[in-house]
Amino acid sequence: MATTSPSAMDHVSKKPKLADGEDAMDVDDKENRKIAKVAFDHETHMRIYYDSLFPAESMMKWLAYGNDLKHPQADAGFMQRREFCFTLPGDVFVRYQSFKDDKELRKELKSKLPSKIDIGPVFNVDPSKRLAYSGGAGSDRVFAPTEREFVMDIDMTDYDDVRTCCSAANICGKCWPLMTVAVKVIDAGLREDFGFEHLLWVYSGRRGIHCWVCDDRARKMSNESRAAVAEYFGVYKGADASGTVKRVNLTSPLHPSLQRAYADVLDPFWRRKILPDQELLTHEKTKDAILAMIPDAEARSRVESAWKGSDDSVARWEKLEQIVQRAIKADAKNYALRRCLHDIVFAHVYPRLDVEVSKHMNHLLKAPFCVHPKTGRVCVPMDPKTADDFDPMRVPTVNELLNELNAADGKVEATRMQKAVDCFNETFWNALEKECKGDLAAKTRENAATKGASATEW
């Protein structure tokens, strides 16, 4: 990575301090109102960021999947078929760009200074030449995607009916555990149920999380296969016509993957974090919605009576469980009642995906390491194994990184960006790079064996 002299950054404001007693994880809304602002000049600061901090080399190595190597089996034109989309200030979209290497990418970043970078699929031809391949149905000259990472998008706004602490773009330490649950459940499902190995988890910079599944077979999946994988996690089905009763797609007994999710993640988080922090059973709106999910009128009435004291949500949940379980013993064939405890937990805590993002190969998704234009936070990789410890409020902003770079005399390795790149490598790229190199070596051996067989036949 390039370095920047201290003099180039003398104008950057120092990192703001939080007020006494204020927790960095208290609240972060779309205007960052509770985190002191510093002056931000897009042109000046983003040019320094793209020149000195943005890990263009790591990004291009990943997206090339070994095809950037001078190897006889590498696809030399692979990267120039990958679409990049820049969003420029003023919401100007520049689509169908491609770059042969990290130097070319960095040059364009410094020139255009995008406020957002999106990554698209690998096409059959250079996307800049697409107009020559738009012959339509039946034509031999068709412009079409050939591969793309399978991606998942989880957004906190989809949980607004569960959150009592925040809404819309706001996030805090009380609702962020919903994202932690999503990472844990989806990561386990993709690895254990589908056998995927190379998953890159990225904080979106504001209120959500993205997952990039980068195994070769994931990148080659059809749109139909992508939809099937996404729907596998589609347990929550929204509210009923009344808008009150939440609907989930569960069986009794639970599917093994859902039983694993419930036992390992959902139930512990529900009791330890969600119930006490969101106070779901003391807030009038959420309390009534949960009561409405008890299908037996008599059991529902008993729960309501048991809640007339001043108990907290955890104590109220325990009473609800006891009453429902007694009702199940009295009517073992009431399958809706037998399922209702699971229904309540899954409806409130199970991951809620934006399925449309996952279904189509040509969907654009924000690139890792770009900067969220509303918060200034960098879209940093996450380690799913330590998802409990991830605090979005402590993710660095551009200004903070520039201050760190200035204080370290331009040494990138002394900034938190280096930690983000280390996380990218250690949790994701190192293993995938080894596999990519192994695949190229295997192709070389296969070709040598084929040539040897042909020579023998001749």
Segment roles from a protein language model:
Residues 150, 209, 365:
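Residue-level detector of short, conserved catalytic/binding motifs and their immediate flanks
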Residues 209-216:
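A short beta-strand motif that forms the metal-chelation/ATP-contact edge
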Residues 224-235, 383-398:
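Aromatic/acidic cage segments in peptide-binding pockets
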